[in-house]
Amino acid sequence: MAHATIDEIEERCLLVAVIHGGVDERLAHEYLDELAFLAETAGARAEFAFTQKLPFPNPRTYVGEGKLQEIKVYADTHNIDAIIFDDELSPSQIRNIERELNRKIIDRSILILDIFAKRARTFHAKTQVELAQLQYMLPRLTRMWTHLERQKGGIGMRGPGESQIETDRRIIQQRIALMKERLKEIDKQMTIQRGNRGQLVRVALVGYTNVGKSTLMNLISKSEVFAENKLFATLDTTVRKVVIDNLPFLLTDTVGFIRKLPKQLLESFKSTLDEVREADLLVHVLDLSHPNFEDHFETVNTTLQEIDKEEKPTIIVFNKIDSFSEEVSLDELKRTWMARLGGRPCIFISAVDKTNIDELKQVLYHEVQRIFKIRYPYNDFLY
C-alpha cells in the first residue's frame, strides 16, 4: 500500500495556499516561504507558488475550479511531480484534486509527518511518528488505494474493492493499538525517570522550530546535543543536569513547534510533551532575526495552552541578535517587548557568538532559586 510522501530523489513541486482570515500579503508570503522550507527539508524543490484569497478553503477542491485549472496547466507544462497544500486536506478533497490534476497530492500534515519520520532517531520517536502517520492514514485508505492503482496504470478510479480496504483498515487499527501500547509502556518508564529526578527544579526550552534551542542547550549544559539549521532537527527529548553557581537544576530540550502542527503529532507526542507539562520553568526561545518572530511567539503560546492549561513561569529569550536587521533599533525593540511582557524576565542573546550568555545564566539562576525557595521554604540547601 502506498501513501503520499516525498521521495529520496528531489521532486519538483508546486505550493498552493488559500489566504483567508484577514491575513495580509506580507504574512501570506512568509507562510509560503515556510512551506517552501518544509518542502526543501523533506527533499523537494518548490518551483512556483499559487495563492487564492477566499473566505475559507473550497470544501471540494480547496481552491476554486478556475485556480485548479491554472495549477493543472502549469503542472502539465513544467513537468511537476507533486502539489503541496498549506493546510490539511480532507480525504474527499485529496480525491477530487488528484482526479483533476493527476499528480501526487501532499497536504501540510503529511509533509510535516514525513519530515518527522526522517528525523526520528530513537525507538521512542519512531513509535510516536508511526502512530501519528497511521492515525492520519486511517480515514484516507480509499484515496490511497486509488492513488496506488493509478501509479500502476489502473483504469479510472478502480480500487482494490471494499473487502481489501476493510482488511487494510483492520490491519492499521491493530497497528495503532500496538503503537499505543508501546507508548503507554514508554510513558510509564519516563514517569518513573521523572520521579527519580528528586527535588531538582525542571527547566524546559520551548519555541518555534529552528530558533536555536539545541545550540542554546549545548551552551548552557556544556554538552553536545544535535543542532542543525533545519526544521525539526530535534525530535527526542534531551535532559541534562546543569549547575550554575553551585545551584543544580534539570534542563530539557524539546521538539520545536510550528504553525498548523498536525493534531496527530500533538496526540502521539504526549510523552515527549509531558516534559513541558511537568516543567517548573519554561525558557521560550525566539529567533529575533526572523521577520515573522512575533507570529511564532503567538503560535508557541497557543500550542502551549493546548497541551497544558496551567500558566508557568517563563523566561523569554530573544536569540540571534547577531543577525537582527530590522528598521527599528534593538534598544527600541527591547523597550517595546519589556513593556509588552509585563515584568516577565526577558533577555536578548546570540547563541552563535555567545553574546549575553552569562547574563542568561544569571537570570536562570535567580528564577530557579526563586522556584526552589517557594517549593522548599525550610530547606537549607540554598542558604
Segments the model singles out, each with a brief description of its role:
Residues 1-113:
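N-terminal accessory targeting/assembly segments
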Residues 22-27, 58-61, 119-124, 164, ...:
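Flexible beta-alpha connector loops of hexameric P-loop NTPases
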Residues 45-48, 57-58, 230-260, 281:
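Switch I (G2) and immediately adjacent beta-strands of P-loop GTPase domains
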Residues 110-129:
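Short alpha-helix plus adjacent loop in nuclease-associated cores
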Residues 195-198, 219-249, 263-271, 293, ...:
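Switch I (effector-binding) loop of TRAFAC-class P-loop GTPase G-domains
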Residues 265-290, 306:
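Inter-motif core of Ras-like GTPase G domains
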